Amino acid sequence: MAELFYDDDADLSVIQRKKVAVIGYGSQGHAHALNLRDSGVDVRVGLREGSASRAKAENEGLKVLTVPEAVKEADVVVILAPDQHQRGLYTADIEPNLNPGTTLVFGHGFNIRYGYIKPSADLDVVMVAPKGPGHLVRREYVDGRGVPVIVAVEQDATGGAWELALSYAKAIGGLRAAGIKTTFTEETETDLFGEQAVLCGGVSQLVQYGFETLTEAGYQPEVAYFEVLHELKLIVDLMYEGGIAKQRWSVSDTAEYGDYVSGPRVIDPRVKENMQAVLADVQNGAFAARFIADQDAGAPEFAELRAKGEAHPIEGVGRELRKLFAWVKPSDSDYTEGSAAR
């Protein structure tokens, strides 16, 4: 069983005695910074020169500095920049400006697990990773609740890394729900596998193949869209609420019976073997090496794959159908319809 921690297991004053620099102000960065501030922590945000997020952070009343300036002021540096940017950011702006005995806090273990960032042995290195998007982390905190977090320690140079990690987790509201003890390796490998085999890669491919199967058989694309993509939210919401059993309880007997007899025909043992191969690439570093090499080259493979996905017929059909959905309101003002680019 996993080891769990709650508010009573952490001393908030530990992080309140520190000066914290949150590097990055995206989905997680803004939630961490605001929750820390509202928990009485001395926090500043480190952003690159010209960052579009500067005004947003300043409008929230946060102190905003360049990354080197923020790091120089801090006892705790929270690295929440995208995985592919962390290595360069750490080498150029963070590492040269670290104070002795600084604690590094990560929201994901990628760069530590695969060795792209190698902190010196005198630093504490911890991870506090909420299991939800930043807007939910912030909203739950404001409402007096919290999103569960996973907590790990990679280096404990001072002997106080766990105490600080739990204090930090409490400050962002995570221990109101629960903190789950893990390792950088476990978090990274399970997170990447889940994204690739199920949550992103697996589901996206399954939906596209379902759409292609129906339209190639002569069914209307609009009807196919409803059956394989639109209604997916209804099923996922039921799973989210009560697991697979709750989903099966909620659907018709016809749908439940079809689940049992046809699901294994589509997702057969070969799929599990393919999943095991994906996991192996995550474990041995092959995926990480491929991703970082492509990013270092300007991301040509990434751009090609993204463009291919955007050009799939289901995207055009969906754009037109969603115009009919008065109940669906765009939640991201900076999103361009039909594009995965950020």
From Swiss-Prot:
Positions that bind NADP(+): 25-28, 48, 51, 53, 83-86, 134
Pathway the protein takes part in: Amino-acid biosynthesis; L-isoleucine biosynthesis; L-isoleucine from 2-oxobutanoate: step 2/4; Amino-acid biosynthesis; L-valine biosynthesis; L-valine from pyruvate: step 2/4
Recorded catalytic activity of this chain's protein: (2R)-2,3-dihydroxy-3-methylbutanoate + NADP(+) = (2S)-2-acetolactate + NADPH + H(+); (2R,3R)-2,3-dihydroxy-3-methylpentanoate + NADP(+) = (S)-2-ethyl-2-hydroxy-3-oxobutanoate + NADPH + H(+)
- Record bears the keyword NADP: yes
Name its GO BP terms in alphabetical order.
isoleucine biosynthetic process; L-valine biosynthetic process
Q: Which GO terms describe its molecular function?
A: ketol-acid reductoisomerase activity; magnesium ion binding; NADP binding
**Protein known as:** Ketol-acid reductoisomerase (NADP(+))
Stretches that traverse the bilayer: none
Q: How is the cofactor bound?
A: Binds 2 magnesium ions per subunit.
Q: Of which family is this protein a member?
A: Belongs to the ketol-acid reductoisomerase family.
One GO cellular component this record assigns the protein to is:
cytosol
Superkingdom of this protein's organism = Bacteria
Q: Per its UniProt record, what NCBIfam families does this chain match? A: ilvC, PRK05479.1, PRK13403.1
Residues binding Mg(2+) 2, per UniProt? 191, 227, 231
The kind of enzyme this is, by top-level EC class, is: oxidoreductase
A Pfam family matched in the record: KARI_C
Q: Which gene encodes it?
A: ilvC
Which residues take part in binding substrate?
252
Organism expressing this protein natively? Beutenbergia cavernae (strain ATCC BAA-8 / DSM 12333 / CCUG 43141 / JCM 11478 / NBRC 16432 / NCIMB 13614 / HKI 0122)
Q: What is its EC number?
A: 1.1.1.86
Give start and end of each KARI C-terminal knotted domain: 183-328
Ordered alphabetically, the record's keywords are: Amino-acid biosynthesis, Branched-chain amino acid biosynthesis, Magnesium, Metal-binding, NADP, Oxidoreductase
Q: Where is the active site?
A: 108
Q: Which cofactor does it need?
A: Mg(2+)
